[in-house]
Amino acid sequence: MPMQGAQGRLRGSLNATPPTTPHSGLAGNQTGPWCLEVSIPDELFLSLGLVSLVENMLVVAAIAKNRNLHSPMYYFICCLAVSDLLVSVSNVLETAVMLLLEAGVLAAWAGVVQQLDNAIDVFICGSMVSSLCFLGAIAVDRYITIFYALRYHSIVTLPRARWAIATIWAASVVCSTLFIAYYDCTAVLLCLVSFFLALVVLMAVLYMHMLARACLHARSIARLHKRWRPVHQGLGLKGAATLSILLGSFFLCWGPFFLHLTLIVLCPQHPTCSCVFKNFKLFLTLIICNSIVDPLIYAFRSQELRKTLKEVLLCSW
């Protein structure tokens, strides 16, 4: 039936798992009694998406309102908020359309839904790639701030920041289009996974180096005041906790999704991998949770931004 075809297509290239072959000896739904499938209610999924949408819209509004926040660092944070906003919107839109399909409301529009599916998939993939890129850009920006403080404004200029932002958005559109067009190509999946792993390594190295530099700086200051141990230990624990939250939330929210892509390449027919495939909606939910956490880590810790956010909220009332 056309409606069934459209609905299957709407599930998207992103969560498409390779079909089982007659030679595998494994039925499509046979994963063993030990397989745990976490069911995510549509209401919860939509609610998280709406929370992320509102939260990131507030970040964008606050940065747009306050001219003091019109700097490269906040431009990157604003673009991260836009990317996270698009992640939420696209996933919420896809879920809403699927619910309408299941209810039969869009049965007469199957052809339009198929075209909408392509646009939504590109939207989802592009926003994910751009979100990851801007997380990396923020890490690089903070690294330059600490290690090249005196030269920061000559290195990270507004024109260069705008070029970097434009390049990231353009690359995200190209990557998402290629991924949706060639989602069944092993090389494309491996490129995405490699990109994620490279970004994890980059962020870990940069932030750990920044933490080491901060501890060394605190040690130097504490020696001058002859109270090295308590100050150094306190800063080290606080920095380690911040680093753990930053990298931990990033890996926890994004790791399962890229594990899913990796297993599609490595073991598409294995029962254990098939069990992982069943939890794809959980992985998307974790990515939306990351869109909720990002403003808390990168935006709302700024006193200036929080002050502007209060003004935005008061004006809205």
From Swiss-Prot:
Annotated CDD domains: 7tmA_MC1R
Positions bearing carbohydrate: N29
Residue intervals passing through the bilayer: 38-63, 73-93, 119-140, 164-183, 192-211, 241-266, 280-300
Record topological domains on the Extracellular side: 1-37, 94-118, 184-191, 267-279
Molecular function as annotated in GO: melanocyte-stimulating hormone receptor activity
A Pfam short name: 7tm_1
Cytoplasmic topological domain: 64-72, 141-163, 212-240, 301-317
Lipid attachment in record (S-palmitoyl cysteine): C315
Gene3D superfamilies xref list: Rhodopsin 7-helix transmembrane proteins (1.20.1070.10)
Keywords on record: Cell membrane, Extinct organism protein, G-protein coupled receptor, Glycoprotein, Lipoprotein, Membrane, Palmitate, Receptor, Transducer, Transmembrane, Transmembrane helix
GO cellular component, one term: plasma membrane
Subunit structure, interactors included: Interacts with MGRN1, but does not undergo MGRN1-mediated ubiquitination; this interaction competes with GNAS-binding and thus inhibits agonist-induced cAMP production. Interacts with OPN3; the interaction results in a decrease in MC1R-mediated cAMP signaling and ultimately a decrease in melanin production in melanocytes.
Function of the protein: Receptor for MSH (alpha, beta and gamma) and ACTH. The activity of this receptor is mediated by G proteins which activate adenylate cyclase. Mediates melanogenesis, the production of eumelanin (black/brown) and phaeomelanin (red/yellow), via regulation of cAMP signaling in melanocytes.
Family according to the record: Belongs to the G-protein coupled receptor 1 family.
Record-given protein name: Melanocyte-stimulating hormone receptor
Species this chain originates from: Mammuthus primigenius (Siberian woolly mammoth)
